[in-house]
Structures are given as C-alpha cells and as structure tokens.
C-alpha cells in the first residue's frame, strides 16, 4: 500500500499481464481500505486484486498469504532513519526478522522467485536502517544456498531515494519552497535519486532476468 506498491500494481494492471491474482499484503487497515476504494485498485474493477491484512513479523499469517503464490516482491520495511535510531528493536523485528519470515514462507510454499527491495544505505551503513537492510540483503542472497532442490530464486534490487515517495526529501523541499527557503544539512551532501517509474522498471527487469543471487543496482 506504499508508494512503490501502488505504482507497481498500476503498471501490472495497465500492461494486462496474464496473472490470476495480485495479493496486497500489509498491516495498515486504513491504507488498504482507502486503496481498495480507489477506482485504480477497486476489487470490483479488477477481480485479480486481493487485500490481506498482515505483518511480515507474523510468520503464520505470511505463510497463509503466500500459498499458491509464484512471485513475491518484498517491500515492507521501517525506513525512517531517526525513528530507527530511537526504536532499534522494532526495526530489527521488521527489517531483519520480517525478511527471514518472507524467505522461510517462500521456501515452504514453493514460490518461484522472490525480489527484495533494498537501499543504497545498505552499503557501508552508518545507521541502523542501513545495517538492517544490509542484513536483509545477506539473508536473501544466502537463501539461494539453503533452498535445497526447490526451484526458487532470491534476488535484491538496491536503489537510492525514490523521488516523491512517502517520507522522501522531495515533498519536504516542495513544502519549504512555499516558505521561500530550503533547509539542508550540508552543502556538500549528495543523494542518489530515481523516479518511481524507474524503480518499477528495475523490479520488472529483475523478475524477467534474474536467476538468483544478484544484487541489482541502477
């Protein structure tokens, strides 16, 4: 139900891929309700859509949600850096343990391919968010070695800040522009940015081309 998820699903629906169903798995009841009431994601207009309330921390629920599923795009994460520093236990439960639950559920249910969304902050991490995503990346890549004879692959798509996504800097800059000034941390600071459409294109490419063990970067 986040920025990426909505854009990704809209792309799939527009391209009319021959899928039987798309399961939208998230823990926020309100966001799911609002999304399901939208004309873009209404179950009456799109019979393939299914809305599941659940949390990646809850392995039992995740197991149920991924039964008879061929592909998983794992985008659940706590990603606000300051919040993560103040709530480290919660970040670990979602970003690391939650990722492990996705891996185990995928293997148990014979999923064909799993793509996990990562971040440039996982490279030489300097905060808990980056460190937790690095751990998650390691879990997904190494899972290609523990799957046994099951025909399942795990890959990672690692990109930077997605422009316009919830919690990104661009909406904040737009607000500041209305006040006539920009508050920045350092003049030498740089950010790696891609658009939502570019992020979706990367995941589509990964679904079509990865064989397991790759970390895809822009």
Model-based region annotation:
Residues 17-34:
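Conserved glycine-rich Rossmann-like NAD(P)H-binding loop of the short-chain dehydrogenase/reductase
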Residues 51, 91, 114, 154-157:
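Hydrophobic/aromatic anchor residues within beta-strands of the central parallel beta-sheet
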Residues 50-71:
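Conserved Rossmann-fold cofactor-binding substructure of NAD(P)-dependent oxidoreductases
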Residues 28, 38, 120:
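Residues in the short beta-alpha loop(s) of Rossmann-like NAD(P)-binding domains
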Residues 1-17:
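N-terminal Rossmann NAD(P)H-binding glycine-rich loop of SDR-like oxidoreductase domains
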Residues 71-74, 78-82, 86-134, 138, ...:
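Conserved Rossmann-fold NAD(P)-dependent oxidoreductase catalytic core, especially the SDR/UDP-sugar
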Residues 126-129, 134-214:
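NAD(P)-dependent short-chain dehydrogenase/reductase
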Residues 26, 52-53, 93:
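Conserved residues in the N-terminal Rossmann fold of short-chain dehydrogenase/reductase
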